[in-house]
Amino acid sequence: MEKMSRQLPLNPTFIPPPYGVLRSLLENPLKLPLHPEDAFSKEKDKGKKLDDESSSPTVPQSAFLGPTLWDKTLPYDGDTFQLEYMDLEEFLSENGIPPSPSQHDHSPHPPGLQPASSTAPSVMDLSSRATAPLHPGIPSPNCMQSPIRPGQLLPANRNTPSPIDPDTIQVPVGYEPDPADLALSSIPGQEMFDPRKRKFSEEELKPQPMIKKARKVFIPDDLKDDKYWARRRKNNMAAKRSRDARRLKENQIAIRASFLEKENSALRQEVADLRKELGKCKNILAKYEARHGPL
């Protein structure tokens, strides 16, 4: 009863304005003094707390006074449930959770001045955990929206080798044709014949039939006029050109065949070396699989 009848001293800064006492009370609330017993008990509790903290290791406590995360319940509706974007750093700062417990215990800097390099791994770990579904029976939206395909596992920028033109491949062949043979295989006044580049068509490589000479027709001397001799000279020149062209083609084919024989032997030797190297690689691979299992 004595406590009820005691008058409380008013705040000296409190001046009730003329426009309303209720509004002034809301804006400037009264500050009640503490009772001596309450103040003494609070001082006692504070000293006890300090002794406990000095004797026991420090335990990180949250300064957030609101409800904790695990006390919150999310309303779930199968049709309207959606995951929204959340800033992870803001979420951690709101709930008073340090980025990593090791930094909270050993770092001399305050949480707001911690270097970004030390918090990066823990933030990545927490972000990977945050993408997990909230309920075990509900798959995450990333799995529902973008299923993983087998083709996506391969890198996008694969270095695929460009196709090689077989004509551009130069096989090292120790072949030096005779200059006299090259002269016989080349047309006078034109480029020298090159057996490495010259190719013949299938029609040119077909065997040619033997040409039989026509039967000689006896013509008396009194009929051998100027017209006869002009026709005779013309036929002889055509026959000579035909023989020269045929001989030139035969010489070119012979030199080309000689070069191809040399190239073929060089390629055979190269294939033999490659097969030998392939056999060694297969033996090494077989030993590795026998020791460490199949690849």
Swiss-Prot record:
Domain of life: Eukaryota
SMART domains reported in the protein's UniProt record: BRLZ
Stretches the record annotates as Leucine-zipper: 248-255
GO biological process terms on file: rhythmic process; skeletal muscle cell differentiation
Protein location: Nucleus
InterPro entries assigned: bZIP, bZIP_sf, PAR_bZIP
GO cellular component: a single term: nucleoplasm
Region (Disordered): 36-76, 92-149
Keywords annotated in UniProt: Biological rhythms, DNA-binding, Nucleus, Transcription, Transcription regulation
Sequence ranges of Basic and acidic residues compositional bias: 36-52
Description of what induces expression: Accumulates according to a robust circadian rhythm. Displays only a moderate amplitude in the liver (1.6-fold) and none in the brain.
A GO term, aspect molecular function: DNA-binding transcription activator activity, RNA polymerase II-specific
All copies of domain bZIP, residue ranges: 225-288
Primary localization class, coarse: nucleus
Basic motif: region residues: 227-247
Subunit structure: Binds DNA specifically as homodimer or heterodimer with other PAR factors.
Family to which the UniProt record says this protein belongs: Belongs to the bZIP family. PAR subfamily.
Additional information: Mice deficient for all three PAR bZIP proteins (DBP, HLF and TEF) display a dramatically shortened life span and are highly susceptible to generalized spontaneous and audiogenic epilepsies (due for example to the noise of a vacuum cleaner) that are frequently lethal. The down-regulation of pyridoxal kinase (Pdxk) expression in these mice may participate in this seizure phenotype.
Full protein name: Hepatic leukemia factor
Organism: Mus musculus
